Curated annotation (Swiss-Prot):
Gene3D superfamilies: 3.40.50.2020. It comes from the Archaea. It holds the Pfam family Pribosyltran. The keyword Metal-binding does not apply. This is Transcriptional regulator GfcR.
């Protein structure tokens, strides 16, 4: 498994992916992605490896019906915090969930639920860049927003998007994720709900 992750990380790097994009593709932390790209498949020093869990949800992501079912469960979690005007997906992997959740939430409430997209700083090549909400989707100012991502690894991206939303005059009401590897229950007063929480023993 580890050699396969190293191979995938090196392949993604050769295709021009940033460390943040590699981390997202492999569902690992940026530190782990950086470590993987520096390894060779023949000499792996396990002592130096960051403590992390690789998450593979290909069987879910490859099926639109499975994505719809899981998104409905995530929408159900979000609705306990009230009606949202906008569902914001964190690029790249949070966007399909957010799209399907907005549809489900609109059907449940009878109100139109818009879609917004956030591009986190970890996807930017410029060191001084900031994360940004795409101008091609819904505006968030004055709106009640549910934030959606696939995996929380460190919590930095979630904290970043909550800060950006508040700075733009939005009211984030909840964060929903498929998998939480960090055990985060709230970010800056915004509750975090996960379908699956991974805990390390020992």
């Amino acid at each position: 498994m580890e050699n396969e992750l190293i191979r995938k990380a090196r392949e993604l790097r050769s295709r021009g992916f940033t460390t943040g994009e590699i981390a997202d593709e492999l569902n690992v932390s940026k530190d782990t992605a950086r470590w993987l790209t520096l390894q060779t498949t023949t000499s792996v020093s396990r002592k130096e490896a960051p403590v992390d869990f690789a998450i593979n949800w290909e069987s879910l992501g490859g099926s639109s019906s499975r994505m719809r079912y899981v998104s409905a469960a995530m929408a159900d979690m979000a609705l306990k915090y009230g009606v949202a005007d906008v569902v914001l997906g964190i690029a790249i992997s949070g966007v399909p969930f957010a799209t399907l959740m907005a549809d489900v939430m609109g059907a449940e409430t009878g109100l139109e639920t818009s879609l917004a997209v956030f591009h986190p700083v970890k996807h930017r090549k410029d060191e001084g860049a900031e994360g940004a909400i795409s101008s091609n989707f819904a505006k968030v100012k004055g709106k009640r927003v549910v934030v959606v991502d696939d995996v929380i690894t460190s919590g930095r991206t979630i904290a970043e998007v909550v800060e950006v939303l508040k700075n733009q005059g939005a009211k984030p009401i909840a964060v929903t994720v498929l998998i939480d590897k960090k055990g985060i229950s709230e970010v800056d007063g915004v509750p975090v709900e996960s379908l699956i929480r991974v805990s390390r023993l020992g």
